Amino acid sequence: MFDKLEDLLIRYEELMSELSEPDVANNPERFRKLMKEQSDILPIVEAYKEYKQCKQNIEDSLAMLEEESDEEMRELAKEELNDAKNRVAELENELKILLLPKDPNDDKNVIVEIRAGAGGDEAALFAAEIYRMYQHYAETKNWKTEIMECDDTGIGGMKSVTFMITGAGAYSVMKYESGVHRVQRVPATETQGRVHTSAASVAVLPEAEEFDVVINEGEIKWDTFRSGGAGGQNVNKVESGVRLRYIWKNPNTGVAEEILIECTETRDQPKNKERALARLRTFIYDKEHQKYVDDIASKRKTMVSTGDRSAKIRTYNYPQGRITDHRINYTIYNLAAFMDGDIQECIDKLTVAENTERLKESEL
């Protein structure tokens, strides 16, 4: 591990030197590439530098204890020695986690699909609340959210909604939300006061870039149509809605299937086409990486972020004001704040659980 850390320290110094060269500054593509590499290894370098300083502090404190006869100074040295030893242990664990292979999708934007499960209007209302929860959470992270497709009930619920979250590291955080979310509460329409259970499923997909998948755009069949919704004469006269059909062969199964995607969210047909293509790329990328996801799921016992969308991951119990995440057996009692987007504490616990799991799998 320490040989690798020394190599990274040397590489960081090389990058700093290269970035200061005029020819690099005049080459935007190379400059961006080097800046990305530098920012990726900076947290490791900073932690390792602190680790080395703490090791030096331990040596200095031990030397002081051998040489110093003044009792007050010896006590100070003992205190500094203890602090340095504790920090070294913490940093060793941090460095092991920082050296774990990074998920190649972690830096990507995400496309989130929320679908109401069984439960009629109540399930659709819960799906809409889950959407708003993520919307509010995204605001706290300074991320941008944009609806791509929505099937609303007209009474505040959503049968389904697909939206994009754009922001640094969105997938690294949102990937923990894939799965079935279950709600237990008394619906507004319930006259007997009985608690009902309904659910919504969430799929979080890393947005695929154009170079991530191969699509023969000449084989896409496009249809246009008048999109429904509020907003004046444009809705009736302009065919801004788009529908694409694309035959795709799954490389993992060898089976060909037709992909159908509609986009009606804007009154700008080119923009709707662009969004439909983005969803097509993401769908194919997700399917092509399913084997990788399945392999991870088969190896891991806790399934913190395997992407298994059929797994029941969380229960929202309104009568008790309780949220329980079943993957890590974690319960909190701040449901109102949680539904308003205060989910970071839960995300942090899931991140720690996954890193612990990955450390067990690694040889570090």
Give the ranges of each region predicted by the language model.
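Charged, heptad-repeat coiled-coil alpha-helices that serve as long linker/dimerization "arms"
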Residues: 1-110, 356-364
